[in-house]
Amino acid sequence: MGLGQLSAAPLPRSFFDRPSHEVAPDLLGRVLVHGPVAVRLTEVEAYGGPGEDPAAHTYRGRTPRNAVMFGPPGHLYVYFTYGMHFCANLVCLPEGHGSAVLVRAGEIVAGLDDARARRTPAAGRRARLPDRDLARGPARLAVALGLLREHNGLDAIWEGSPAALRPLTGNLGNPGDPGRSGHGPEHATWLTGQGPQHATWLTGLPHGSAAVLEGRPADPDTIRSGPRTGVSTAKETPWRFWIDGDPTVSPYRAHVPRRRSSAATSVGETPSS
């Protein structure tokens, strides 16, 4: 499936101004864009706020590390875990609530070559990765999208005219220099790694920005829910949501106790700070 088959209409901030366990299933089938890569979300997990969800980073209150989760809805909360991985969340509820949805897996619908180039070194092997594995799991998804510590707090809501945010295809110029004469449309993000002759530009989205697009919402009959992956508390809370039968969904793994520093907490572990 390509981006051209999906709606490029941006989701409004009000979409995220709800409890995370309501937002999470509605995110399935939506498209998260960052830079040249776009991912159709197929698996997510909801995390609640302070005093509500023992598995959430915000359970014990606000800290410098989780401060973005207490900010406005629709921003990216990106954190480092296990000393090696980044994971990305979308903040929910009004400012001050400390709730978010972890984006766990998805299908690359634009920027496949860029995603593959980012993932291959991380995979530590020369064999070609199957397309389904490029964003299969939260750390892999963050790598594919190029999300790092500096993107923590990035706004993923497009505030401009929805009509201005649309894909264009064809020979539109050099993807490395958008916005200049002869080099593609102004204020656009180049979304493929196949060269300008076959490029897709998402017009209206400044280069390097993020956005959540309408995509194609998952059929409710295909949505499944169950316990969250790897959490040691609130183990039975069914706030992991996925599209049944989609090959990009990551396998479920129960929590396995391990010794690690407090700085290397997993998605489902409450940080000690």
Specify the residue positions occupied by each region the protein language model found.
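Conserved, well-structured core segments that form or line functional sites
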Residues: 2-179, 183-273
